[in-house]
Swiss-Prot record:
The gene is DERP6. This is Mite allergen Der p 6. Keywords: Allergen, Hydrolase, Protease, Secreted, Serine protease. It comes from Dermatophagoides pteronyssinus (European house dust mite). Residues 1-20 form the Peptidase S1 domain. It comes from the Eukaryota. Its EC number is 3.4.21.-.
Length: 20
């Protein structure tokens, strides 16, 4: 997910919580 990688799906929950 970091850097808009294609594997963002795996870090979706983490990214959403961080950006929240």
């Amino acid at each position: 997910a970091i850097g808009x990688q294609p594997a963002a799906e795996a870090e979706a929950p983490f990214q959403i919580s961080l950006m929240k």
